[in-house]
């Protein structure tokens, strides 16, 4: 899979915020297997870019393409299939089912497009230190725990790219390192690309390319 951005200009962003960007108003190609870091100061359109990449929002000029096909010409059914099999994501606001248990949040995702066995949920939860939370409602967990839940959930499906929006904002250094290692391990197994957007450089991410939004 290849993601291409051709002269993307958000409808809502001031001109001065797009003039010096490595992304806005540029041609950017992100190939499967590449690890791309996007450093985006507050107000530069980081989360909007993430939503553009995932096809949630289309309030921009220019073209965003999956495998040379404009996302604006992709049908809802095609987009749903792409999200199920090729694109995984950790949203900044996580979007967990707060009244479901942690395990249910993970297992629902796994069963929609099975890639791992259920046993891997326990293994990943152990690696990220949330095994004792699996039977607890997700909404009662701390935000840092919820971030780890969202990361593990995103790793349950097949993907060619995983998109991450400030995935470690509420994690300490030790937990950030563990989470990044797990993400990279799973991406490498699939030969998948990683797109990580954050407010500043992430020292735990071995990016092949850094873009400044």
Where are these regions (language model features)?
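Conserved ABC ATPase "signature" region
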Residues: 70, 118-133
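Helix-to-loop junction immediately C-terminal to a conserved catalytic motif
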Residues: 54
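Catalytic Walker B motif of ABC-type/P-loop ATPase nucleotide-binding domains
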Residues: 162-166
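Conserved ABC transporter NBD signature motif
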Residues: 62-73
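ABC ATPase NBD coupling module
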Residues: 71-88
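Conserved ABC ATPase signature
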Residues: 137-145
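Q-loop/switch helix immediately C-terminal to the Walker
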Residues: 93, 99-112
């Amino acid at each position: 899979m290849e993601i291409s951005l051709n002269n993307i200009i958000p409808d809502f962003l001031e001109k001065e915020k797009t003039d010096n960007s490595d992304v806005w108003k540029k041609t950017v190609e992100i190939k499967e297997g590449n690890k791309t870091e996007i450093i985006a100061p507050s107000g530069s359109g980081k989360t909007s870019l993430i939503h553009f990449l995932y096809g949630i929002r289309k309030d921009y000029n220019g073209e965003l393409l999956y495998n040379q096909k404009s996302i604006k010409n992709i049908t809802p059914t095609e987009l749903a299939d792409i999200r199920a099999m090729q694109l995984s994501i950790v949203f900044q606001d996580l979007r967990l089912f707060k009244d479901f248990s942690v395990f249910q949040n993970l297992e629902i995702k796994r069963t929609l497009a099975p890639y791992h066995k259920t046993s891997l949920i326990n293994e990943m939860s152990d690696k990220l230190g949330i095994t004792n939370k699996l039977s607890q409602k997700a909404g009662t967990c701390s935000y840092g725990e919820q971030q780890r839940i969202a990361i593990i959930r995103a790793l349950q499906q097949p993907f060619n790219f995983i998109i991450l929006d400030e995935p470690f904002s509420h994690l300490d250094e030790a937990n950030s390192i563990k989470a990044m290692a797990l993400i990279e391990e799973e991406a490498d197994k699939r030969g998948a690309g990683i797109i990580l957007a954050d407010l500043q450089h992430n020292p735990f991410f071995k990016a092949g390319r850094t873009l400044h939004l």
